[in-house]
């Protein structure tokens, strides 16, 4: 019996959240085409035979001078030391530069290099990319390919991961999908709805806070606030006649319902907290680190 923690690491938009959702066969992590959508660590539990793998989705590695982004980067780097194994995701169309930047961080834990999105490339191109990464073979414990759209890639990857995990009793009940508090997942779904329904800088200067969750027979009631930095942003989030916040609510509610399998009542309001994304105290309070 093995049980251990695996940090999913990669650049922004490398598909880390989609990777975790695919392994779980369930959506718990935020997915967006916009950069830096993942702000909090989300854990997912995958059973592979008698072995238990606890995956952690992390913010993407990138370069930025903004306080909020520096906090996210620091948490991703910290997670590399808090795990038993690292899985580094390298999209098949990328060159090796992001992987080389990862190696420059001198990760202490062993890692598996996973070439993702291989369904988007020909076999010849995949083999060519594998050859390019072979020059780093003394750095990684294994090199595998993966596609979230083709389930045949899942089992070989899980088997390889389990080879590198320690012998240990289960950390969690094998029936659990995630040890992450459901409020954290709900707020991530609201944030995803913000990313999908607003453009420009507004999503990056906004976040969500769950005020309360009430479980009633057949329905989950959620009361939440969207935090943003400026009054003009509040007006844009609400939209003309409340149309934008209505779209955000509908989008988020569908995501939550798919996870909870209950009807969901979601009440959103918007709160202005000036400069929250630039102040360490506010960042820690709102993002939760």
Swiss-Prot record:
Its main location: cytoplasm. GO terms for molecular function: GTP binding; GTPase activity; ribosomal small subunit binding; small ribosomal subunit rRNA binding. GTP binds at residues 10-17, 57-61, 116-119. Belongs to the TRAFAC class TrmE-Era-EngA-EngB-Septin-like GTPase superfamily. Era GTPase family. It holds the Pfam family MMR_HSR1. Residues 57-60 are annotated as: G3. GO terms for biological process: ribosomal small subunit assembly. Residues 116-119 are annotated as: G4. The gene is era. Residues 10-17 are annotated as: G1. Residues 36-40 are annotated as: G2. It is found in: Cytoplasm; Cell inner membrane. An essential GTPase that binds both GDP and GTP, with rapid nucleotide exchange. Plays a role in 16S rRNA processing and 30S ribosomal subunit biogenesis and possibly also in cell cycle regulation and energy metabolism. This is GTPase Era. Keywords: Cell inner membrane, Cell membrane, Cytoplasm, GTP-binding, Membrane, Nucleotide-binding, Ribosome biogenesis, RNA-binding, rRNA-binding.
